[in-house]
Amino acid sequence: MSAVTTLFPNEAIGTPEIRVSHQIKGRTPDALHIPTKDLQDFQRTSYFERMAFIIKIPGIAETINGNRLELTIGGVRAYNQENLYSKKAYEKFKFFIGFQNMVCCNLCVSTDGFQSEIRAMSSLDLEAKMIQVLANYRAQEHLNSMQNLLEHNLTERDFAQIIGKSRLYNFLPKKEKLVLPDLLLNDGHINTVAKDYYQDESFCRNANGDISMWEFYNLLTGSNKTSYIDTFLERGVNAFDFSKGISKALSDRNSIYSWFLS
């Protein structure tokens, strides 16, 4: 919280929201030989393998296509990505600043607002590195890029082509895949995007079957809600890059993203 209040001293800061997953139950070292049924409460241990938090700053907000976006800061701590038995020299965290779409609670995160790995030796070290990420974030540029998505539309044929090529993407030979942009969403996410193209109340197709790139982007971030805590930030950033890339490919068939439309 101190890093947030340092950068936004005049803003009302929301109460942190915390989510945990993958509970791990264990025992203290002195109870290794005791059968599980005979363990005393003080001999049992429990921790969560993954934790995520977000902090909203509702006073900094923008509206895109009728959707209110509020500045949001958050991070992830994931033990599953570390060797807990090795000698620790530092702690690792993921950290981001972006916007949350209050219509659907989708997180909108860009590359410059995300640090996939912060290595910190102490809480003060962590705070300093968080402040650096916050200071380098270009909020208005991020908002402008999201606003620009409204200027591009996918036809039903375009959308179907993207869905089909996205399903093929993960089966491409490695050599062919290397020359294409990354797509981190898996088949489960793509299936959700296809379903919500018809069924989502806020971002579905219009009567002609068309969908704006802003709506398409929100279908991607909506599908990302099913991702594990330790992977959803990378996929969220990738969803934004992918949406911008497809937008460009609609008018530039020489774009590396044009493969998804061809």
Region roles according to the model:
Residues M1-N10, T15-E17:
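Charge-rich, low-complexity N-terminal segments
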